[in-house]
Amino acid sequence: MNVPFWTEEHVRATLPERDAESHKGTYGTALLLAGSDDMPGAALLAGLGAMRSGLGKLVIGTSENVIPLIVPVLPEATYWRDGWKKAADAQLEETYRAIAIGPGLPQTESVQQAVDHVLTADCPVILDAGALAKRTYPKREGPVILTPHPGEFFRMTGVPVNELQKKRAEYAKEWAAQLQTVIVLKGNQTVIAFPDGDCWLNPTGNGALAKGGTGDTLTGMILGMLCCHEDPKHAVLNAVYLHGACAELWTDEHSAHTLLAHELSDILPRVWKRFE
């Protein structure tokens, strides 16, 4: 299967400029439902990725015990106490530019109830980690973006990992069409497949990303870029590209063994500037 690469030239042509006359409302408010008592860091990692990626304002809906752990590091966000639990009980009352749910959340029925309520919104929705399950998705205005690693793809589809890895692009494209979602199949040369049949490979990244938390950062980056890009496709593709490019810059100066996920967000401003 001949799948094109999303290249540096594509990124330069599609990354948005920051209008000098803009304000935070121009780029909208994003909602991140993430982080539990057992995995509090996921909310912080995704939040840092989002705040570095072009949004106007970020609301983090996380467990009450997680909030005081995050605020000293991410005071720029606002917080919705037990937000992901409350989203399971009722539909969202606020309007958001984009929503992400799943980093650091358990694989429970209540999380899937929160997913159901989130999907009633019109905006783009990212599902990651604990929000990924074998299910169907309603027809809606904004895209649904699934960000599985191979094990999560198996949980979603039943395709064994060893079989998936032989034909990554084919399976991602097939299931994107079947589920009518965007699928970001993470791994070496991440596959980004769209429900209309469009499919791309990402050329950036390296083994430094083979560490816990880097996927949470990517989810946050996609969330932020959905707020500053007009085209959701470009937002997803550019987020994946820059995420990998951050890892490449890291290994220009450090061992691939040593990257910590939060350092991707520290590196991102330098990488982004290269493409402006």
Curated annotation (Swiss-Prot):
User: Which Gene3D superfamilies does the annotation name?
Assistant: 3.40.1190.20
Does the keyword section mention NADP? yes
YjeF C-terminal domain sequence ranges? 7-275
Keywords attached to this Swiss-Prot or TrEMBL record, sorted alphabetically, are:
ATP-binding, Lyase, NAD, NADP, Nucleotide-binding
Q: Which residues bind AMP?
A: K186, G187, N188, Q189, T190, G215
The alphabetized list of GO BP terms reads:
metabolite repair; nicotinamide nucleotide metabolic process
Residues that, per the record, bind (6S)-NADPHX: A42, G104, H149, D216
Alphabetized Pfam families for the sequence: Carb_kinase (PF01256)
This protein's source sits in the domain of life called Bacteria
Cofactor(s) listed in the protein's UniProt record: Mg(2+)
Catalytic reaction annotation: (6S)-NADHX + ADP = AMP + phosphate + NADH + H(+); (6S)-NADPHX + ADP = AMP + phosphate + NADPH + H(+)
InterPro entries, sorted: Carbohydrate_kinase_pred_CS (IPR017953), CARKD (IPR000631), Ribokinase-like (IPR029056)
User: Membrane among the record's keywords?
Assistant: no
Output one GO MF annotation.
ADP-dependent NAD(P)H-hydrate dehydratase activity
**EC number(s) per entry:** 4.2.1.136
Its function, per the record, reads: Catalyzes the dehydration of the S-form of NAD(P)HX at the expense of ADP, which is converted to AMP. Together with NAD(P)HX epimerase, which catalyzes the epimerization of the S- and R-forms, the enzyme allows the repair of both epimers of NAD(P)HX, a damaged form of NAD(P)H that is a result of enzymatic or heat-dependent hydration.
Whom does it interact with, and what assembly results?
Homotetramer.
Q: Which family does it belong to?
A: Belongs to the NnrD/CARKD family.
| UniProt xrefs under NCBIfam families | yjeF_cterm
Name of the protein in question: ADP-dependent (S)-NAD(P)H-hydrate dehydratase
Q: Which organism is it from?
A: Bacillus subtilis (strain 168)
